[in-house]
């Protein structure tokens, strides 16, 4: 898995340079598990979730039916190590990076054109012997479904099904448009087809 750390600046495509003047290696979405094209995101130091989400808008220009862009602000004293994803619909469309203490990680979960399904999945971060599981779900048909989000810290990777339905020890999911607060993680998912998922982890 590729990880790019950029402190005090943000990641861009290979044709540009980051603010501190260091060239960025070109990485395609195929390298990160997606389709063709450049899709580099990473970690911003000392930046909150709102500023981080704005940087995603400045960098990522994906043309997809459904997505949620996510900013995970790590306010704990631990490094959150990227530990994989669990897909229900769609996939990680960008690089999925570790998040040092005091930094904010940014990425995009997307569902490209094709089957009429939403953008839904779980991302996992490991720290010590614990795993932070973050779930978000954006529907395709808003007449039938709503957006939901959840979080859980446990000793294993939690399934989408359990987090979505609040099963096997998971708290009930939080409806989009509302703040959730579970296991030291505060989160907010907007109710939009192109949504924002804000996460503040204090541990």
From Swiss-Prot:
Localization, UniProt: Nematocyst; Secreted; Target cell membrane
Motif Cell attachment site, residue numbers: 175-177
GO BP annotations listed: cytolysis in another organism; monoatomic cation transport; pore complex assembly
A Pfam family it matches: Anemone_cytotox
Disulfide bonds listed in the record: none
Cellular component terms (Gene Ontology): extracellular region; nematocyst; other organism cell membrane; pore complex
InterPro entries named among the record's database cross-references: Actinoporin_PFT, Anemon_actinoporin-like, Cytolysin/lectin
UniProt signal peptide: 1-21
GO function term, MF aspect, one: channel activity
Expression tissues: Strongly expressed in the gland and mucous cells in the endoderm.
Assembly mode: Octamer or nonamer in membranes. Monomer in the soluble state. In vitro, interacts with folate receptor alpha (of target organism).
Entry similarity comment: Belongs to the actinoporin family. HALT subfamily.
Cited function: Pore-forming protein that forms hydrophilic pores and causes cytolysis. Compared to equinatoxin-2 (AC P61914), it reveals lower cytolysis activity (5-12-fold difference, tested on erythrocytes), a larger pore size (probably 2-3 nm) and different affinity to membrane lipids (100-fold lower affinity to sphingomyelin). Binds to sulfatides (SFT). Shows cytolytic activity on HeLa cells, with a different potency than its paralogs (from most potent to less potent: HALT-4>HALT-6~HALT-1>HALT-3>HALT-7>HALT-2).
Alphabetized PANTHER family for the sequence: BRYOPORIN
Notes concerning its domains: Composed of a long N-terminal alpha-helix and a core region rich in beta-sheet structures. Before the pore formation, the alpha-helix binds the lipid membrane, partitions into the lipid-water interface and stabilizes the monomeric molecule on the membrane. Finally, it traverses the bilayer, thus forming the transmembrane pore.
Protein's UniProt name: Hydra actinoporin-like toxin 2
